[in-house]
Amino acid sequence: MAKIIAFDEEARRGLERGMNQLADAVKVTLGPKGRNVVLEKKWGAPTITNDGVSIAKEIELEDPYEKIGAELVKEVAKKTDDVAGDGTTTATVLAQALVREGLRNVAAGANPMALKRGIEKAVEAVSSALLEQAKDVETKEQIASTASISAADTQIGELIAEAMDKVGKEGVITVEESQTFGLELELTEGMRFDKGYISAYFATDMERMEASLDDPYILIVNSKIGNVKDLLPLLEKVMQSGKPLLIIAEDVEGEALSTLVVNKIRGTFKSVAVKAPGFGDRRKAMLGDIAILTGGTVISEEVGLKLENAGLDLLGRARKVVITKDETTIVDGAGDTDQVNGRVAQIRAEIENSDSDYDREKLQERLANVAGGVAVIKAGAATEVELKERKHRIEDAVRNAKAAVEEGIVAGGGVALLQASSVFEKLELEGDEATGAAAVKLALEAPLKQIAVNGGLEGGVVVEKVRNLSVGHGLNAATGQYVDMIAEGILDPAKVTRSALQNAASIAALFLTTEAVIADKPEKAAAAAPGGMPGGDMDF
């Protein structure tokens, strides 16, 4: 396909026009009085949202240079969302301000590479200042405040704080659609996986159709069990101990299954067989997780262990196991704490190294099962459009709350960024590097200005007022009052604010150092087919 090329100022201005169109659509959502944006969908009802990354993803521009500019800013929003789960609108506003100020200096003759170095040094100094300002999250109320701001709903914030309190910071909080109106929280203690009993005859409570085993032995096998002769030596040892048995295997079938069922029905021996969760390598990993959590060993011929030779020392233990037809929950596994912590560290390292969103999600589920627990927030709404929007807000708020626990909290509402500009007094830069740092200092005002504008106030006046207030004091845009932001619960996770600034600066540096843009040449629309002859579709 033929290409078109733009150079110098023409190239940079083309990129800037695209960035401005995207940023102007996104920034109207910033702050407590930010508006919503309606997104048309090819199928189904339109989506109404105030989430920056969702809006950015929908924008496709016609002009090839503008399209590239918009795509670069989409990357800012996406990267911030991936890392911190929130702050996408702030990142977009910062990027727009940095690029605008930087391009003005480039047009005036500043060296783009020196500007880039100045921007990078300034951003590093501000990021360090933000982390120094950050206060550790100490109370459930602080988590609730942070999540409430992200979701623009105090009920959602309180529910997320409740969920995090129950499952811990490593636990998984998932959001599901509910058929009922309102919000519900469902908690699962211990490890849960989505495989239930192989036969309904294993149920111990026929009314609820679930099997409950107290203080059972747990046999973990990475293969099918069909021959009862392989299982008998171990069954006899477990029966002598007087404890029930949970068997987790690829499958239990044939005479092995019928022997277990018959003994359960007669009351001779209490046991339950369930299929192993997952497939392939993921199944091996999950069986390993169960073994470490329960203090058992995976019996697999790959490591030279055979079922017929297995003793009680290879079995895991737990305080309680509850099995339904769809899922199994293991409570208080008897695994060694050091081994469990080692497994947690290993899974966390795999998450950091994974490039696939799907793999990362599955690894997060494994991490939650090993380290914490699982909480499910069920969200309902009057219409499908509202339900989608609400679910998305809750997912963002969950990630926001986790970011707050990770790196602490700073004053929200754009105040932390503005007041971090005090670090510029200590920066000793000269020439165009100093000009680059000055562009960052000016850009730090942009989020607060935009929040004020969206609240119907004069941005410049608000910035000057907040600049002269004590550290941590700023504008509560919801009421128009100047308050102590942290005392009022107007908080942002330090990780969100820091990521927004770093990602915005990264893209701004690319804009400023661009000297040429190469894009696909737009194809001319094909000429329409000529119309038929008069009466050409009539029968004679």
Curated annotation (Swiss-Prot):
Primary location class: cytoplasm
Keyword terms, alphabetized: ATP-binding, Chaperone, Cytoplasm, Isomerase, Nucleotide-binding
Reaction catalysis annotation: ATP + H2O + a folded polypeptide = ADP + phosphate + an unfolded polypeptide
Name of one Pfam family that matches: Cpn60_TCP1
Enzyme Commission identifier(s): 5.6.1.7
SUPFAM superfamilies listed in its UniProt record: GroEL apical domain-like, GroEL equatorial domain-like, GroEL-intermediate domain like
Membrane spanning stretches: none
UniProt binding sites for ATP: T29, L30, G31, P32, D86, G87, T88, T89, T90, G413, N476, A477, A478, D492
GO CC list: cytoplasm
InterPro entries: Chaperonin_Cpn60_CS, Cpn60/GroEL, Cpn60/GroEL/TCP-1, GroEL-like_apical_dom_sf, GROEL-like_equatorial_sf, TCP-1-like_intermed_sf
GO BP terms in the entry: protein refolding
GO molecular function annotations of the record: ATP binding; ATP-dependent protein folding chaperone; isomerase activity; unfolded protein binding
Intracellular or extracellular location(s): Cytoplasm
Biological role: Together with its co-chaperonin GroES, plays an essential role in assisting protein folding. The GroEL-GroES system forms a nano-cage that allows encapsulation of the non-native substrate proteins and provides a physical environment optimized to promote and accelerate protein folding.
Family statement drawn from the similarity comment of this UniProt entry: Belongs to the chaperonin (HSP60) family.
PANTHER family noted in UniProt: 60 KDA HEAT SHOCK PROTEIN, MITOCHONDRIAL
Subunit structure: Forms a cylinder of 14 subunits composed of two heptameric rings stacked back-to-back. Interacts with the co-chaperonin GroES.
Protein name, UniProt field: Chaperonin GroEL 2
Organism of origin: Streptomyces albus G
